[in-house]
Amino acid sequence: MPVQKFLKTFLWLVAIHSCLVGIFLIILPESWLAFFGYIGYRRSFFQVQGGVFHLVLAITYLWAARNPLRDQSLVIITICAKGIATFFLLLYYLLIEPIWIVLLSALGDFLMGSIILILFINLKKQNQPAKEVS
């Protein structure tokens, strides 16, 4: 599978993941929060806001997936979003509250961002004009 097609497909999968996480955050009943490690946590505006933010990111990922070579800035935003999410989630897990789903989310964002970065670098290498040999 060519690199661009693989990157497009992977960005679609990341967008679907983000959309599902967003919807899940918005509709998750308060009674389920303890299962995910949020003991004593009460549903709040910020939970729903996080869900809406995931939906916004999903749109960005879908736009990046349309043509990653033409819309390189959207791919870079995607990589940055995954890097920032990884950093934030790891810090939260290590310094604030060791919630297992937060650590799992950090690892997932790191993996997704790393794969996108590797594919993007390979796509750019593959599409560089050949250098003339004199």
Where are these regions (language model features)?
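Membrane-embedded alpha-helical segments of multi-pass transporters/permeases
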Residues: 26, 62, 90, 114-117
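Short helix-capping/hinge motifs at transmembrane helix termini and TM-loop junctions
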Residues: 28-29, 37-38, 68, 93-97, ...
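Membrane-helix boundary connector in multi-pass membrane proteins
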Residues: 66-69, 87-104
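Hydrophobic alpha-helical segments of small multi-pass membrane proteins
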Residues: 75-89, 105-116
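Membrane-water interface at the C-terminal end of transmembrane alpha helices
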Residues: 111-134
